UniProtKB/Swiss-Prot annotation:
GO molecular function, one term: protein serine kinase activity
PTM-bearing positions, type Phosphoserine: S192, S367, S389, S439, S455
Cofactors required: Mg(2+)
Phosphothreonine, modified sites: T184, T187
Keywords recorded for this protein, A-Z: Apoptosis, ATP-binding, Cell membrane, Cytoplasm, Isopeptide bond, Kinase, Magnesium, Membrane, Metal-binding, Nucleotide-binding, Phosphoprotein, Serine/threonine-protein kinase, Stress response, Transcription, Transcription regulation, Transferase, Ubl conjugation
Bilayer disposition of the protein: Peripheral membrane protein
SUPFAM superfamilies: Protein kinase-like (PK-like) (SSF56112)
Protein name: Mitogen-activated protein kinase kinase kinase 7
Residues annotated as domain Protein kinase: 36-291
Catalytic-site annotation from UniProt: D156 (proton acceptor)
Quaternary structure note: Can form homodimer. Binds both upstream activators and downstream substrates in multimolecular complexes. Interacts with TAB1/MAP3K7IP1, TAB2/MAP3K7IP2 and TAB3/MAP3K7IP3. Identified in the TRIKA2 complex composed of MAP3K7/TAK1, TAB1/MAP3K7IP1 and TAB2/MAP3K7IP2. Interacts with PPM1L and PPM1B/PP2CB. Interaction with PP2A and PPP6C leads to its repressed activity. Interacts with TRAF6 and TAB1/MAP3K7IP1; during IL-1 signaling. Interacts with TAOK1 and TAOK2; interaction with TAOK2 interferes with MAP3K7 interaction with IKKA, thus preventing NF-kappa-B activation.
Amino acid sequence: MSTASAASSSSSSSASEMIEAPSQVLNFEEIDYKEIEVEEVVGRGAFGVVCKAKWRAKDVAIKQIESESERKAFIVELRQLSRVNHPNIVKLYGACLNPVCLVMEYAEGGSLYNVLHGAEPLPYYTAAHAMSWCLQCSQGVAYLHSMQPKALIHRDLKPPNLLLVAGGTVLKICDFGTACDIQTHMTNNKGSAAWMAPEVFEGSNYSEKCDVFSWGIILWEVITRRKPFDEIGGPAFRIMWAVHNGTRPPLIKNLPKPIESLMTRCWSKDPSQRPSMEEIVKIMTHLMRYFPGADEPLQYPCQYSDEGQSNSATSTGSFMDIASTNTSNKSDTNMEQVPATNDTIKRLESKLLKNQAKQQSDSGRLSLGASRGSSVESLPPTSEGKRMSADMSEIEARIVATTAYTKPKRGHRKTASFGNILDVPEIVISGNGQPRRRSIQDLTVTGTEPGQVSSRSSSPSVRMITTSGPTSEKPARSLPWTPDDSTDTNGSDNSIPMAYLTLDHQLQPLAPCPNSKESMAVFEQHCKMAQEYMKVQTEIALLLQRKQELVAELDQDEKDQQNTSRLVQEHKKLLDENKSLSTYYQQCKKQLEVIRSQQQKRQGTS
């Protein structure tokens, strides 16, 4: 904070010059910093430190820059926030000029990332909450993409930049430090690798469709409650390389076909094949009819029982049938049902079964009983050995039930658009009696063609799974998503070098001239140097981490030595006291003997 104060303690005139760019007109309220009462630091954004504060008797979040290098990001966020006004975008109250900071709406629920993967205890949430969050995110981004005269690309959509308010029921987009006008078509790679569209880190010109790709990853993340590409690990360029080669998050067991189709379309390698954010809003709005309860506040567990729930973070009672989508290794291998480490989505309320049964009786098309596998009864927090999940399969059955007799609308739609989202396969529901944290899990869909399943060659958990259904001899589906057939994903030698893409924009090699051997040689040399640079930087990071560990161990050793020295001194002091007391005891004993002898002499003489 002292650095931020130093960086922003210049005169108000220089601060005004920094904010008032000649090519833009900013519409914001200038706030006197003396009116703000800072309470605590709550995190960081694309730039600067974010603090919770009081301003005019209400909670606000203030973002202060820490160095001169963050001024550009500050200008970008101030410019973009001053243009927007949407219920799903964080509100800008104004800005301070001395020190330079933004004053924004405060989100008491924290980020979506913390709700999904934060510290214990994690809240329970339903499929309705997950779908509602994605719908609200798409509505906010669609608003950005439709702005006039210049639309905006956020470029850094990810759960840490999505804030929750109103008990976790309302989502707001924040952190516009990397946003740009669509006309800008930036070519650097700001953002986060796990949610980043391939065209962004490949250095190509990109459009608003990069936000669509990020949205698709977020949809997968809120359904599975798992971090995307977490199994890859390592530096960011490892994830970039995998995404470039066609790897996508594994498909989800029992996920209804409409949601799966929308999600995989967003992952398309070709941006033109991805749906627009406006189309996503229409699809999600249509699907939300089958997910009631999104307006109910999130519930946090009051306590954990001693038997199996005290450490819910490691609970692996549920399984998701997922498949790797590394398209460079296609095979006929079915993936094992991988345990979900974050099983936290609560079951739908029991009233859904009543609504479903009523709709089925009205339509006359379906007759599905409330079996144990598809039960949606709410269980109390103290129940043990019960399965707590939101079975997406019954949601799909309700979609079929409510639309089987619906008159189709006029007009036509493109293939794989939401016009044919009701083409649903058979649902297989599995059961498990282990206690665990709740999630949308066990989403297995059957009835697809064999030979379409690929697996990551390094996966340690591969086994064959078959179905017992009498109507099909095909194996249970664990189908990965693959990009267009025309996409080169076999890792050939002509793949672009990816190491330099993780460098800062100014350090990346310029594109060579293909007709010049000298230019190509310089480019290849620069790429090799960039790869070596990244290797050295990684080693430095590991060594620094090891240094910190050794420093911590050294500090602990010093503390242990100090404790040992203190104990030795205390022991020596106690020995001295014992010796002194022993001497005093002997003296007292001698004095007692003298007194007794004197008394005996007196008695003898008397």
